[in-house]
UniProtKB/Swiss-Prot annotation:
Residue numbers bearing the Phosphoserine modification: S128
Lineage: Bacteria, Pseudomonadati, Pseudomonadota, Gammaproteobacteria, Vibrionales
Function field: Then it catalyzes the NAD-dependent ring dehydrogenation of precorrin-2 to yield sirohydrochlorin. Finally, it catalyzes the ferrochelation of sirohydrochlorin to yield siroheme.
Cysteine disulfide partners in this protein: none
Family indicated by similarity: In the N-terminal section; belongs to the precorrin-2 dehydrogenase / sirohydrochlorin ferrochelatase family.
Protein name in the entry: Siroheme synthase
Amino acid sequence: MDYLPIFTDLKRRPCLVVGGGDVAWRKARMLLKAGADVRVIAPVLNQAFQQAIEQQQVSHVADEFESSHLDGIFLAIAATDRKAVNALVYQSANQRQVLVNVVDDTQRCSFIIPSIIDRSPIIVAVSSSGKAPVLARLIREKLEALLPQHLGRMATIAGNFRARLAKTVTSFSARRQFWEQVFDGRFSDLVACGQEQDAKQELINLTQSTSPQGQVALIGSGPGDAGLLTLRALQLMQQADVVLYDYLVSDEVMDLVRRDAELVCVGKKAGFHSVPQEETNQLIVKYAQQGKRVVRLKGGDPFVFGRGGEELEVLFDANILFQVVPGITAAAGATAYAGIPLTHRDYAQTAMFVTGHLKAESDQMDWSTLARGKQTLVIYMGLMKSGHIQQQLLINGRAGDTPIAIIERGTQKKQKVIKGQLSELEQLAKNAESPSLIVIGEVVNLSEKLHWFGKQEQSLQQSAVVKLA
């Protein structure tokens, strides 16, 4: 081990920064964040330093560095572009037994500054001992993605509860088991949802009961590309005991679920066995009441034609804790991957999202509004009703030559885009499979320039050739 990682309390300790440029300011800002009394030595300062001095955050000596500037200093950092000055800072600090760091010169460092993941009071430091700083930064980025933002709040609440716990739970091993249960259970989810008073009450409840309480996370998995999954969604998926998922959730996303989680398909798809919504609701409640951490995983966003609101109402009535993690809805994700902007100053000032899967057989659509020009119309689950959609839009005034696109499996490796005109919609839909999104409006033509992902768009004629072949 080349260096011993030590976390140092710098609050109100005098720390010196030599240099007045951008690099020196980054180091000074880090010291300020740790509560240090920062002094800067430099003839000239950048604007950030000048603002900090005006706000009395740092003190400044407008002079060249001298050894006497280290008198009474706890820690020093040299960040100038002059090797002779940096060497003098290092030599002078060593003579006074002052900790010193010369930026980008490990030979002149008695300490080095690691890459930091700050979830105060939880702090994680990553260092390559100065050998590969970029690698250390990449490792830090990966850890940033894995560590939830609410870790610090969890640690603070837990720290304030430790003394109280010691009075009621005297055994060290029992206290350890208590905290393991706390940090892997409902307490964590309450803090993540900003319900800190309930989280504190949960700690009290856990000292009086050993039965775990279940919770549900309603998660949007996005349109298919696992890279579009949110960090929060990934964290919860890897903590789940049970995952109830739809057919629209891609295999890529399902591969990221915790390996030993129970997987339950509750999807609905034409031609396949479908689980009624009422049965899905009952399953979610059942698993949560067993004390399990349940993930309800939906394609796209759960609140955009996903019936997420209905499922949460059932959980509310059953007094079960829940949280919602939004996902990128197909209208945003699939169109972006197809090179179709939803709005454009020249072509569309409005974007409307509607579902083609109507309740029962009633048609409650305001077709006169949907048929307006200068807007983009995005239709979810519209393939089976494509003929009706085409007919109603034409009857209500939308031009037959309005550009349209059907995006099949948007954002996924098998994405296919079929383009044509509104007058061809019903015929085009015969060449597409679910899940598909219908986009209607002049913005579709922009995909000729903006298309960047997957197969090139197919026209009606190309699709017909494929079918004949």
